[in-house]
Amino acid sequence: MVGGAAGLVVALLLGVLLSAEVRFVLRAAYEEARILLARRSIAELLDDPELGEDRRTMFRLVLDARDFAANSLGLAAGDTYTTFAEVGRDTLVLVVTGARRDTLAPFLWRYPIVGAVPYKGFFDFEAARATATRLERRGYDTYLRPSAAFSTLGWFNDPLPSTALRRGPVSLVELVIHEIAHNTLYVPDATPFDESFALFVGYRGAEAFFLGQGDTARAERVRAIWRDQKRLSGFYADLVTELEALYAAHLPAEPRERERQALFDRAQERLMGPLAEQLEAFDAASVAERPLNNASLLAFRIYLTDVDLFDRLLAEHGGDLRATVGAIRAAIDARGDRDPFEVLATMVPH
């Protein structure tokens, strides 16, 4: 599901010079430098006879996946994930999302180059929790989630963090292709588009990768996960529509809060009822354990906005993912100031 190490684009180092949050900046700069200094060539690690078989298998899978991303999908792999860094913990960063309680409006953090981003990743987990607490005191909903990886958008040769190796083969290949997709196409101030595009490329790319390897079982596993992602996308989109109607009514605070909670309760019932029966790869109970509020809903939607639109575009290109990515890149490059999702909508029949 969304979260985990689903691909995270954060400006942890890019904001160093302009950020006023000194403690955050210093910790981010230190941790990024530590990760970069800890890099070791995966090719050299594979030459080490002392390397354990599990890691050897995963490292080979990573190199094969990034080569596939570059050579078969035309993605800008560069030197991303040709190195490995041991980070010494299970979670790389803790990500904070905030949103107003009376409207589906995210709290935005602004960084150079990447623009406004509706989340903030912390290496210092206590600082992440403190930030969430401060937002809550200001009346915001908050949501905290772990992430096992992030992308510097090609500014640095991102190493594979050891946290990523906690994933299974299917999830690891999706992560590699997802993060390389960020290197390939990134639209400032358009996080839902950027993450939904990368999620689409990650899963459809992983499916093509395993099919090319003759591993039909893992390819079908990827397809099942992607179908579940699209089901959840529809579920969250419906909930967004209901909440937008509630907030547009401009009720006083007390009845609005009652109605809001009732909407969330009914959504949980749908999740554990009709939707649970449709899910193929995800466990509905685990999905339902995630808190539902405006912040968590927006965090989920960041990765699951109009994902079926990407699939329709893939169908228009005869299932050719490389051609689809190329068409999307060309259209986005020529979009001017139009919303990227509006651009995509013009590329498929209605």
Give, region by region, the residue ranges found by the protein language model:
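Short, motif-level signal for alpha-helix interfacial/capping segments enriched in acidic residues
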Residues: 29-31, 155-157, 284-286
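Acidic/His-rich structured neighborhood in mature extracellular/periplasmic domains
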Residues: 65-229, 241
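Metalloprotease/metallohydrolase-associated module, dominated by Zn2+-dependent proteases
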Residues: 13-45, 163, 170, 195, ...
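Pan-zinc metallopeptidase signature
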Residues: 234-350
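Sec-exported extracytoplasmic/periplasmic mature domains
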Residues: 47-51, 64-74, 181-185, 202-214, ...
